[in-house]
Amino acid sequence: MAGVLGMILAGGEGSRLRPLTESRSKPAVPFGGSYRLIDFALNNFVNADLMRIYVLTQFKSQSLFHHMKKGWNINGITDRFIDPIPAQMRTGKRWYEGTADAIYQNLRFMELSEPEQVCIFGSDHIYKMDIKQMLSFHKEKQAALTVSALRMPLAEASQFGVIEVDAEGRMVGFEEKPSAPKSIPGDPDFALVSMGNYIFEADVLFAELIEDADNENSSHDFGKDIIPKMFPRGDVFVYDFSQNRISGEKAEVYWRDVGTIDAYWQAHMDLLKTDAPFSLYNRKWPLHTYQPPLPPATFTDSDNGRVQIIDSLVCNGSYVRGSRIEKSVLGFRSNIASACDISESILLGDVKVGEGCVLRRVIVDKDVDIAPGTQIGVNLQEDKKVFHVSDDGIVVIPKGARVGY
């Protein structure tokens, strides 16, 4: 679809995901063993045959650039590209000051692409969405701007932009992260919230960005400034994400904000459920990513016992000897010695776990070496002296750590 340009906001610092974001940006954080968070946004575009995409980066972007270069390089195909663009301070010596400013500072690239519509999406949520369906809705309504939205429990809605709509789907109210969110009429326990995904008519977007950039009182953010200014005109519409249908998927849509350690851990546990609400296996909606050239995972018994793999994902290049792995995700090249007991844990890859270790509800970042006999997640009071422990008791081992030596 040559008239459509994708702009993916991938500059998030991800401070609430520390220590996983100490050395990488939030969109580059691994997920589900084989993927990075950025992959899910990119797949939503590519599987909808929308292949003119700029990815806007900012903080600690080297890991993200490396991943995209290896896994998402489609340059050379006429009128198709997926190009990362680092923050370049084109409008002055300053970083992006808000989501709208990030797009404004790259106005030149958009104008050169001559789009009719511009799709502006985030890159740090887990979901599948056929963007063409939202685009069709946008065109049908002859909207200047379309915002995708979903129902959210009222208790959680204050973290998002809260929307009011009329019977035709037109936005008639919007408040960014309100302390007292308004509920959906007739549905008092839920609010309608913005997913942070927008489709603009290109000429409207360009004009709004230029006007906003000249406004010294603006925070240069779509949720705080652009949307509240636009919706009273009557040409801003709201796309109901629950109506998005993907062949081979359940009717009930799945969307998770993984902006905290606890949410990130829970989204992984969702993958491991018998009837997982988010599937990695739909052939009609393949999840593309970079797959390193590694041998299959290997499982062997040992003198200390038989290997047991229960309700888990184990990636290529991994080696598990005579250990029990339950409800866990093991990333590439996870090396597990014998007599280990690992449950409800996430190993991001290139992790070595020595003989007789016990891991309970632990996230282990890359390049970690855990000494034989180490127990983590068993005594949280002791763990807190050394590691980050989340509100829900998830222990996080930082990248490159040597534990128990």
From Swiss-Prot:
Similarity-based family: Belongs to the bacterial/plant glucose-1-phosphate adenylyltransferase family.
UniProt xrefs under Pfam families: Hexapep_GlmU, NTP_transferase
Subunit structure and binding partners: Homotetramer.
Lineage: Bacteria, Pseudomonadati, Pseudomonadota, Gammaproteobacteria, Vibrionales
Keywords: ATP-binding, Carbohydrate metabolism, Glycogen biosynthesis, Glycogen metabolism, Nucleotide-binding, Nucleotidyltransferase, Transferase
SUPFAM superfamilies associated with the record: Nucleotide-diphospho-sugar transferases, Trimeric LpxA-like enzymes
UniProt GO MF annotations: ATP binding; glucose-1-phosphate adenylyltransferase activity
Keyword Transferase on entry: yes
EC number, as in UniProt: 2.7.7.27
Protein name per the record: Glucose-1-phosphate adenylyltransferase 1
Biological processes annotated in GO: glycogen biosynthetic process
Catalyzed reactions per annotation: alpha-D-glucose 1-phosphate + ATP + H(+) = ADP-alpha-D-glucose + diphosphate
Binding site for alpha-D-glucose 1-phosphate: 96, 161, 176-177, 194
Function: Involved in the biosynthesis of ADP-glucose, a building block required for the elongation reactions to produce glycogen. Catalyzes the reaction between ATP and alpha-D-glucose 1-phosphate (G1P) to produce pyrophosphate and ADP-Glc.
Coiled-coil portions: none
Highest rank taxon of the organism: Bacteria
Keyword Transferase among UniProt keywords: yes
Species whose genome carries this gene: Vibrio vulnificus (strain YJ016)
Pathway, per record: Glycan biosynthesis; glycogen biosynthesis
